[in-house]
Amino acid sequence: MSFEINWEKLSSDSDLTSNIREGLNGYFQELELPSYVRAIELVDFGFGKIAPNITLREISSPLQDFYDAVNEEYEEDNETSSEMHGRDGQNVGESGEEAVVEKKETDTQFLIEFEYKGDMSLTLTAELVLNYPVERFMTLPLKISISNIGLHSLCLVSYLAKQVFISMLCDVSDPVLDDVDCVLDPNGPVLLANKPLERISIIRSMKIETEIGDRFKDDGSTLRSVGQLEEFIVQKLKDFLRKELAWPSWVNLDFND
């Protein structure tokens, strides 16, 4: 069963796009950068106008991992506060009882197939460091544009305790996005990577373009460094999404007051 989402409303949410920029910039600031680059910064992010295709594959009860995560959060809040109220109104802080989220009939989990080949875009700036003829001989400002992003994955979306949990499970075979680094599972549509830890890329394809001054467009050494920088950014973006979204990690949206 397929359904639509209000992509326009999502793309116009300035708080969400700001949080994405802040999250990625915090990640880039923590990276150990190679000697030929410094100061990578995401300066613009846009969801675009093309919405993803979403197909519902299964409806079930949420995984126990999500209940455990909510309970752990309650426990941490209880440790930092002398008074805490559970969802049923009991004073957990004073009684000393452990906060437990009870399973309810309204708790739901969706297994969905998420396919995106849209016009989402990212713009980054960076400084390319030329270390010849001497170290840090020159720095060149670069503008890096990323577009044509392709994703096709199975995803869990769980709702419980007024919270939504989102986690990517694995890539799905796709005639447009498949490449030589993946093999098809003969028993189903799921992609199996050649290495176990690479069961999911999340980002399967993207277009990356770098603007550099005319003076250096024909300089072989500079162009090689630009190519290395592009590969570095692509890999780190994939690593970031794996770390934040790929199971056993997830994104948690809390709708409690």
Curated annotation (Swiss-Prot):
Belongs to the MDM12 family. It comes from the Eukaryota. The SMP-LTD domain is a barrel-like domain that can bind various types of glycerophospholipids in its interior and mediate their transfer between two adjacent bilayers. It comes from Candida glabrata (strain ATCC 2001 / BCRC 20586 / JCM 3761 / NBRC 0622 / NRRL Y-65 / CBS 138). One of its GO terms (molecular function) is lipid binding. PANTHER family: MITOCHONDRIAL DISTRIBUTION AND MORPHOLOGY PROTEIN 12 (PTHR28204:SF1). It is a peripheral membrane protein. CDD domains: SMP_Mdm12 (cd21672). One of its GO terms (cellular component) is endoplasmic reticulum membrane. This is Mitochondrial distribution and morphology protein 12. Keywords: Endoplasmic reticulum, Lipid transport, Lipid-binding, Membrane, Mitochondrion, Mitochondrion outer membrane, Transport. Component of the ER-mitochondria encounter structure (ERMES) or MDM complex, composed of MMM1, MDM10, MDM12 and MDM34. A MMM1 homodimer associates with one molecule of MDM12 on each side in a pairwise head-to-tail manner, and the SMP-LTD domains of MMM1 and MDM12 generate a continuous hydrophobic tunnel for phospholipid trafficking. Its main location: mitochondrion. Component of the ERMES/MDM complex, which serves as a molecular tether to connect the endoplasmic reticulum (ER) and mitochondria. Components of this complex are involved in the control of mitochondrial shape and protein biogenesis, and function in nonvesicular lipid trafficking between the ER and mitochondria. MDM12 is required for the interaction of the ER-resident membrane protein MMM1 and the outer mitochondrial membrane-resident beta-barrel protein MDM10. One of its GO terms (biological process) is peroxisome organization. Residues 1-256 form the SMP-LTD domain. It is found in: Mitochondrion outer membrane; Endoplasmic reticulum membrane. InterPro entries: Mdm12, MMM1_dom, SMP_LBD. Residues 74-98 are annotated as: Disordered. Pfam families: MMM1 (PF10296).
